[in-house]
Regions:
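Glycine-aromatic micro-motifs
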Residues: 1-121
């Protein structure tokens, strides 16, 4: 079973919510998404958190190891590919158990750039 690393911000940092959405997901560490900032964007029905490129900024993220089934559940939750798209990155991940830093290939959900800026809903 192939596992991938997912970087989370916002509601997907909530351990209880992630357990409900992705029962096999495992917290493995933390990192920072450098050169990005958090902001709310959305649609007529509401605004949601996303990340967007912004030089000099940084977003702290949690890192989850997810199975293919977990990733499919996240795709549904995030409205992929219509509302959010996935971006692949390589980031240094600080392990929860060991504190060691290792570079890992990760994916993150980012709202499409054409979505208007909004306020939390």
């Amino acid at each position: 079973m192939e596992k991938r690393y997912y970087i989370a911000y916002g509601s997907n940092l909530n351990v209880h919510q992630m357990r409900m959405r992705c029962p096999s997901a495992r917290r493995i560490g933390t990192s920072a998404l450098k050169g990005y900032a958090l902001l709310f964007k959305g649609s007529k029905t509401g605004s949601y958190l996303t990340v967007e490129k912004k030089p000099g900024s940084s977003v702290p993220v949690g890192v989850w190891e997810v199975t293919q089934a977990d990733e499919k559940a996240l795709d549904r939750y995030e409205g992929f590919p219509n509302f959010y798209y996935k971006k692949e990155l390589t980031l240094p991940i600080k392990g929860i158990r060991t504190g060691k830093v290792r570079k890992r290939r990760v994916f993150v959900y980012i709202m499409h750039e054409y979505s208007p800026i909004g306020v939390p809903s």
